[in-house]
Amino acid sequence: MSIVTAVVDAHVHLHACYRPDELLSRARQNLAQARPSSDLPTLRVFYLLLAECQNDDSFGDLRALALGGRARSGLKLQTWMVRTTDEDRCVVVADGSAHIYVVAGRQVACREGLEVLVLGTTQRFEDGRPIRDVLEETEALGVPRVIPWGPGKWFFRRGRLLDSLLEEFRKPTLFLGDEGGRPEFWSYPAHFARGARLGVRDLPGTDPLPFSHDVAKVGRMGFCVPVELDPLRPAASLLRSLVNPNVPFERFASLEPPLRFVRNQIGMQLRKRRRDSHQASA
């Protein structure tokens, strides 16, 4: 095993509107632009941590391809290749000398309007449950659980709830998560400083939205962390560092331009209205 710097995007979706090869190439390009300090090891490896919604299983598709089968969704790779590791929760994708570890994880939409990312697991969780129940259930897994930022999600009632959750569930496996969708004019939310005082750290990632143009930002927000890498068990190697409060993180970020932020928010509202209209007519 060797000590390396892991360059990580901790909130990734492989949406159906994306071309998988483009996502991986963009991620490789963006992660390679991160500039760790001289205190971190020179050798770098790249990670994408998936946070898949209830009905999605892109990781399962990638693993099926790695095992020589077909993806249920029809997902295909053209220039990138995928192979298994010794872990059911991690595959490695490669294009020539470039490779990225892709780690399974889930995104749980909770009843209160907050979300929990459960990283490094293939276990499924139902949406719509109270967030306290989700945090209690996932605590036993010993993997990172992240409450991600979202526009307006940490204000008022939900902001007060978040304050309570930070007090109740503060452990090395609980994190907050900054997102690449935060616009340049939106300052770093105060809850991150509050969490840091309680030992709840920021585990940032891009959280690309389900629009084809958003694939370009995968890998633009994340962090660098020293890892004792076992190439056969790369997920366990990374997660061991993440839940160790004595291991430092160095975040990097490219925030959303204001016009792109407004465009995406309008697009998400229109998407939600179409979905609600379809459900009402069904």
Task: Please identify what each model-predicted range represents.
Residues M1-A10, L14-D21, C110-Q123, E136-L141, ...:
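Charged catalytic cores and adjacent phosphate/nucleic-acid-binding surfaces used
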Residues G128-R129:
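Caspase-like (clan CD) cysteine peptidase catalytic core
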Residues M1-S97, Y101, V108-C110, R132-D133, ...:
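An N-terminally biased module of ancient metal coordination in phosphate/nucleic-acid-related enzymes
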